[in-house]
């Protein structure tokens, strides 16, 4: 709807330029926002105040001329001037109802359409270090990236998930040396954290062991068959742990999406040679570097992008450049989204610019770092165990499920044990994910089990319950969401407010896709649940005045249920028919 209003305003501006009311050459960014007070309309624009000065007119006078120049549109019932010159647009309720009926007739997509042409989008997410088990620091990249990827796919983009795992480097020499020294069974390797800790202790305590580990790195990089076999075994076990976690989190990553650091090994020398051929490479203290004028240190000295160390080794920047080139040349990506910690912002700014100057990306290819903040404990510091260690992600999920089980059992002591466990799993995992997804990704947030498991406020339990409440209406009738007939009629204020929000699902998802911000979808669903609650309390469904009114309200409830379920599914949250 906002796009429609922007188009109407643009047509009015063009007409006023033709009439000489406005000067030529104006290219304003037309802002259309949701009106806060629905008595003043559904949408508002400050365009008259923006252009009053170049027009040499008072804002209200220009607003009057804009209204007169606006083309008629059946979706708009009227336009009014408010305050110093705001244009307030009122939706036509009959046209709005027709849009919702059309959405109900499209159960697969709910009439959601992408703003703009479909693209090939690479989503770089999760990327755990395979030398260790996944910890809480991997949660944000994994679930934020997955949520955005789901939305992009739903809108019609071709999404290529890329799990850029850390499966190479000096740490693997240490692990291989320890594996040679103490051959481990698969069961022993199942606890990667302890295995890594033991190997690290040997590395720190024994120079002979450390030297052997460094030698194994060289042999591994040279393609030694025995080293590669040990490395492959270790990598496969580690990846199986990751896959178990992904499935538990209801994340769509699969082994086929893994494209680790090692996948680019054969291209690293080519990256350096090609940078040299373009004249970008400079030797500094024996290292091969790219210096970009716009990146400088605090004391104004150039800040290099090092692609090869003096000893010949490669760095993360080299691998990232190889990955960018692969994603451009082979995957043919139009857009690449990197869901990586915000603290890596400078690294990506530099690498993206080097890739562009080196010609590693095709024209129009977008490289976007979708940075995120830190998950902190109650003390405001990075989340740790009591002894200061990293918290295993699997342990966090175990505790979430147990806490949810206790909560659900207290509320529903009569429910069978198997069903309690099933509900607790959905509630616990969803609570952890939603507590993260509902925050702006760029923000830090404090992890709090009590808050995230509450049935009040913007939480997963509240939204899951809101969905079961809608489903319960149809369960009482013994019918499904698609069983309601007739047409939607919007008479009561609560019906109109709920309908207006339902109609904004497309806009919400396009916003998430453009900015990589799942919290926008979370806020939408929370608002929608609240509006349904108000509608449910003020507009009786089962006790409606007549069959037509009941069917209309059932259709509103059905679309609310479908939208809540679809939105939660895109976030990777499992819905329940009852709680």
From Swiss-Prot:
Lineage top rank: taxon: Bacteria
PROSITE patterns in UniProt: AA_TRNA_LIGASE_I (PS00178)
An annotated Gene Ontology molecular function: ATP binding
The keyword Cytoplasm belongs to this UniProt entry's keyword annotation: yes
CDD domains: Anticodon_Ia_Arg (cd07956), ArgRS_core (cd00671)
Short sequence motif named 'HIGH' region, residue ranges: 128-138
InterPro entries linked to this entry: aa-tRNA-synth_I_CS, Arg-tRNA-ligase, Arg-tRNA-synth_N, Arg-tRNA-synth_N_sf, ArgRS_core, DALR_anticod-bd, Rossmann-like_a/b/a_fold, tRNAsynth_Ia_anticodon-bd
Localization annotation: Cytoplasm
SUPFAM superfamilies listed in its UniProt record: Anticodon-binding domain of a subclass of class I aminoacyl-tRNA synthetases (SSF47323), Arginyl-tRNA synthetase (ArgRS), N-terminal 'additional' domain (SSF55190), Nucleotidylyl transferase (SSF52374)
Reaction(s) the record says it catalyses: tRNA(Arg) + L-arginine + ATP = L-arginyl-tRNA(Arg) + AMP + diphosphate
Keywords: Aminoacyl-tRNA synthetase, ATP-binding, Cytoplasm, Ligase, Nucleotide-binding, Protein biosynthesis
GO biological process: arginyl-tRNA aminoacylation
Pfam entry (one): Arg_tRNA_synt_N
Cysteine pairings via disulfide bonds: none
GO CC, one annotated term: cytoplasm
EC code: 6.1.1.19
Self-association state and partner proteins as the record states: Monomer.
Assigned protein family: Belongs to the class-I aminoacyl-tRNA synthetase family.
Protein name per its UniProtKB record: Arginine--tRNA ligase
Organism in which the protein naturally occurs: Pseudomonas syringae pv. syringae (strain B728a)
């Amino acid at each position: 709807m906002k796009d429609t209003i922007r188009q109407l305003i643009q047509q009015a501006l063009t007409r006023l330029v033709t009439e000489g009311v406005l000067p030529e050459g104006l290219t304003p960014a037309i802002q259309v926002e949701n009106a806060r007070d629905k008595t003043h309309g559904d949408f508002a624009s400050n365009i008259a105040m923006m252009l009053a000065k170049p027009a040499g007119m008072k804002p209200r006078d220009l607003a009057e001329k804009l209204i007169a120049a606006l083309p008629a549109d059946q979706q708009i019932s009227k336009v009014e001037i408010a305050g110093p010159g705001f244009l307030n647009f009122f939706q036509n309720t009959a046209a709005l109802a027709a849009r919702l009926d059309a959405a109900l007739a499209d159960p697969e997509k709910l009439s959601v359409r992408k703003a703009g042409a479909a693209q090939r989008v690479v989503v770089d997410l999760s990327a755990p270090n395979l030398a260790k088990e996944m910890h809480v620091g991997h949660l944000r990249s994994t679930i934020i990236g997955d949520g955005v990827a789901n939305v992009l796919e739903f809108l019609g983009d071709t999404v290529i998930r890329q799990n850029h795992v850390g499966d190479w480097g000096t740490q693997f020499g240490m692990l291989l040396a320890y594996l040679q020294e103490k051959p481990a069974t698969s069961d022993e390797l199942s606890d990667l954290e302890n295995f890594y800790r033991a190997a690290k202790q040997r590395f720190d305590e024994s120079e002979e062991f450390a030297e052997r580990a460094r030698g194994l790195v060289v042999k591994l990089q040279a393609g030694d068959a025995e080293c590669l076999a040990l490395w492959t075994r270790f990598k496969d076990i580690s990846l199986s742990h990751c896959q178990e976690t992904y499935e538990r989190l209801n994340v769509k990553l699969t082994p086929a999406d893994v494209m680790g650091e090692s996948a680019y090994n054969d291209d690293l020398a080519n990256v350096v040679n090609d940078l040299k051929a373009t004249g970008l490479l400079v030797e500094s203290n024996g290292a091969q570097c790219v210096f970009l004028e716009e990146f400088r240190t605090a004391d104004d000295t150039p800040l290099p992008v090092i692609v090869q160390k003096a000893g010949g080794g490669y760095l993360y920047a080299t691998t990232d450049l190889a990955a960018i080139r692969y994603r451009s040349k082979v995957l043919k990506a139009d857009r690449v989204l990197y869901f990586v910690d915000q603290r890596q912002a400078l690294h990506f700014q530099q690498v993206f610019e080097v890739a562009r100057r080196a010609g590693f990306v095709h024209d129009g290819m977008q490289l976007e770092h979708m940075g995120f903040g830190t998950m902190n404990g109650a003390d405001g510091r990075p989340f740790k165990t009591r002894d200061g260690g990293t918290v295993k992600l699997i342990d966090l999920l175990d505790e979430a499920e147990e806490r949810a089980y206790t909560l659900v059992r207290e509320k529903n002591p009569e429910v069978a044990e198997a069903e309690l466990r099933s509900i607790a799993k959905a509630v616990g995992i969803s609570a952890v994910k939603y507590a993260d997804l509902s925050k702006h990704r760029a923000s830090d947030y404090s992890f709090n089990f009590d808050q995230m498991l509450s049935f009040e406020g913007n939480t997963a339990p509240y939204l899951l319950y809101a969905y079961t409440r809608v489903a319960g209406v149809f369960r009482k009738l013994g019918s499904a969401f698609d069983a309601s007939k007739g047409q939607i009629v919007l008479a009561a204020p609560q019906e109109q407010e709920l309908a207006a929000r339902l109609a904004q699902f497309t806009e919400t998802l396009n916003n998430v896709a453009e900015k990589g911000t799942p919290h926008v979808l979370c806020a939408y669903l929370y608002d929608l649940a609240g509006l349904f609650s108000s509608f449910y309390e003020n507009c009786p469904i089962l006790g409606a005045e007549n069959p037509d009114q009941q069917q209309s309200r059932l259709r509103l409830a059905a679309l609310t249920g479908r939208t809540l379920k679809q939105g939660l599914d895109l976030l990777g949250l499992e819905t329940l028919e009852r709680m």
